[in-house]
């Protein structure tokens, strides 16, 4: 006998799980595990401890320990190999907390039995053990497939039955409409004996029809007159008609002109979301939709002057889950569009802030590079005919400095007893406005999360299985914000977190100061359109 027991315990020595491979009492196992933490010295780098009779081979698992209790004659290298295999298997079936270990105790014991038999390590791999534990059966799989086929056939049959019922109902409605002009008017019995299609006319024999044709025509005329009078009387006197009035039918299914179509649309969307079980109350989602419409800022249209300058910049960043900035890549460009050809050649004076010194600038070959380097002025070289259409200035900065980020987002999943609480917070690091900020967090389960607290707006995408935190506008009134929700899941399953935003100012802090006509050296009116957008911003 080599391995006496395999166990998982806390750092205080509390036994959470133990599988004995020799005759050992419960009190002895608990005593050995309780003494184990006291034997670990501070700052020790070893993974085993020897006493007079036994050896502890252990490995930390976050706040827990996985321990092999062996005799002193065992092969330490083989024991370490066994320990490492068990350490790889535990996270496949449980999280590293007391509640999950106790909840999945039987699955973990089964894995221990697959690795160790009679105290000796089995020659198995990780994939083989996972296959054994899954206990797949060909008969069971075939039974499941047959059940799925039966369910599909039942769904098809139910669908065909529903279509048949709908078709029959439609035919009955059509037949009712055809006969409604004769039978539907009598309702409360107001037709009388002189109504349309009198008993006298119906009692005549078909053989006598031609001989009595003239008399019948006269009778029909009288009957028609009586019918019209009776119809008018029924409309005025009979309150219980079988056919609803035009006003009531219009109010039920007709289109109301001049109504609030936006409110009706929101109500319809809210009803669909409630039926899909995305929200609990229709009123909540209607209020959310109304607030979204009112709070999302509109993008204004910039009127173009004779000289129109477009500045575009894209932001890319990857951040580790602990907040360490892995990389930041900022790319930008400036283009000039001459709408008034009578201006001729122009030169553009730029204003560059402090952050622009960290960027590398590249000018178009047709631009005077020396003048730009000395005075930050963009003008054509001698002999140039016009500004290139594809842009005249580009810049780029690759860094890992957090100060170059317009907004910083932190995600803190904290595992609990029944669920994981996810805390999110954002912090705007710039003084200008950020618009349409979207923070998307994946949901590892099919259950909708419980939102405990949030700033701004939020939405749960049931199909994509993600929580979307929305902040329509970040300015001086809300430079910081937070959100908290709870849902079951492993801490790493809430990543990557993706962030999107836009702004009307660049990180490079390069703006247009003035535009001059070269021939007259007179300033001219110009318009600018500046956009900062996110290419990729992820917390991994």
Curated annotation (Swiss-Prot):
Listed SUPFAM superfamilies: Second domain of Mu2 adaptin subunit (ap50) of ap2 adaptor (SSF49447), SNARE-like (SSF64356)
Top-rank lineage group of the source organism: Eukaryota
Residue ranges with Low complexity bias: 212-229
Keyword Secreted: no
Localization: Cytoplasm; Golgi apparatus membrane; Cytoplasmic vesicle, COPI-coated vesicle membrane
Keywords: Cytoplasm, Cytoplasmic vesicle, ER-Golgi transport, Golgi apparatus, Membrane, Protein transport, Transport
Compositional bias annotation for Gly residues: 179-197, 251-261
Positions of region (Disordered): 169-263
Biased composition (Polar residues): 238-250
Cleaved signal peptide residues: none
A Pfam family reported for this protein in Swiss-Prot or TrEMBL: Adap_comp_sub
Cellular component terms (Gene Ontology): COPI vesicle coat; Golgi membrane; phagocytic vesicle
Family to which this protein belongs: Belongs to the adaptor complexes medium subunit family. Delta-COP subfamily.
Stated name of the protein: Coatomer subunit delta
Lineage per the UniProt record: Eukaryota, Amoebozoa, Evosea, Eumycetozoa, Dictyostelia
């Amino acid at each position: 006998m080599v391995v006496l027991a395999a166990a998982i315990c806390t750092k205080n020595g509390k036994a959470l799980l133990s599988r004995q491979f020799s005759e050992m009492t419960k009190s002895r196992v608990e005593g050995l595990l309780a003494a184990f933490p006291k034997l670990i010295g501070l700052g020790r780098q070893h993974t085993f401890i020897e006493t007079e009779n036994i050896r502890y081979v252990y490995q930390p698992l976050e706040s827990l320990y996985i321990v092999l209790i062996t005799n002193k004659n065992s092969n330490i290298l083989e024991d370490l190999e066994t320990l490492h295999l068990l350490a790889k298997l535990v996270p496949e079936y449980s999280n590293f907390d007391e509640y999950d270990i106790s909840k999945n105790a039987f699955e973990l014991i089964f894995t221990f039995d697959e690795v160790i038999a009679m105290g000796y390590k089995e020659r198995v791999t990780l994939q083989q053990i996972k296959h054994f534990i899954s206990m797949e059966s060909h008969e069971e799989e075939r039974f499941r497939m047959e059940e799925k086929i039966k369910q599909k056939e039942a769904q098809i049959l139910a669908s065909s039955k529903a279509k048949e019922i709908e078709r029959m109902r439609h035919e009955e409605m059509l037949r009712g409409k055809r006969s409604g002009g004769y039978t539907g008017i009598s309702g409360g019995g107001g037709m009388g004996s002189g109504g349309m299609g009198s008993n006298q006319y119906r009692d005549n024999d078909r053989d006598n029809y031609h001989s009595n044709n003239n008399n019948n025509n006269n009778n029909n005329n009288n009957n028609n007159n009586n019918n019209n009078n009776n119809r008018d009387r029924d409309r005025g006197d009979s309150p219980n008609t079988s056919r609803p009035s035009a006003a009531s039918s219009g109010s039920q299914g007709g289109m109301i002109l001049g109504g609030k179509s936006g409110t009706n649309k929101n109500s319809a969307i809210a009803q669909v979301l409630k039926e899909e079980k995305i929200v609990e109350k229709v009123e909540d989602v209607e209020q959310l939709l109304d607030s979204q419409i009112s709070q999302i800022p509109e993008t204004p249209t910039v009127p173009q002057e004779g000289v129109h300058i477009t500045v575009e910049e894209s932001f890319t960043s990857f951040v580790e889950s602990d907040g360490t900035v892995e990389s930041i890549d900022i790319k930008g460009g400036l283009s000039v569009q001459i709408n008034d050809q009578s201006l001729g050649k122009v030169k553009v004076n730029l204003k560059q802030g402090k952050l622009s010194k960290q960027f590398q600038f590249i000018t178009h070959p047709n631009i005077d590079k020396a003048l730009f380097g000395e005075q930050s002025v963009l003008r054509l070289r001698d002999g140039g005919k016009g500004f290139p259409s594809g842009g005249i200035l580009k810049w780029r900065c690759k860094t890992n400095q957090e100060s170059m980020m317009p907004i910083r987002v932190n995600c803190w999943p904290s595992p609990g007893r029944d669920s994981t609480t996810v805390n999110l917070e954002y912090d705007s690091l710039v003084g200008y406005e950020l618009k349409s900020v979207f923070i998307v967090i994946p949901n590892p389960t099919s259950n909708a999360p419980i939102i405990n607290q949030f700033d701004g707006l939020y939405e749960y995408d049931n199909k994509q299985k993600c929580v979307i935190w929305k902040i329509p506008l970040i300015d001086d009134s809300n430079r910081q914000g937070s959100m908290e929700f709870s849902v079951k899941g492993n801490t790493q399953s809430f990543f990557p977190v993706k962030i999107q935003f836009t702004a009307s100012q660049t990180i490079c802090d390069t703006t247009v100061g003035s535009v001059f006509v070269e021939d007259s050296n007179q300033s001219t009116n110009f318009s600018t359109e500046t956009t900062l957008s996110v290419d990729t911003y992820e917390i991994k």
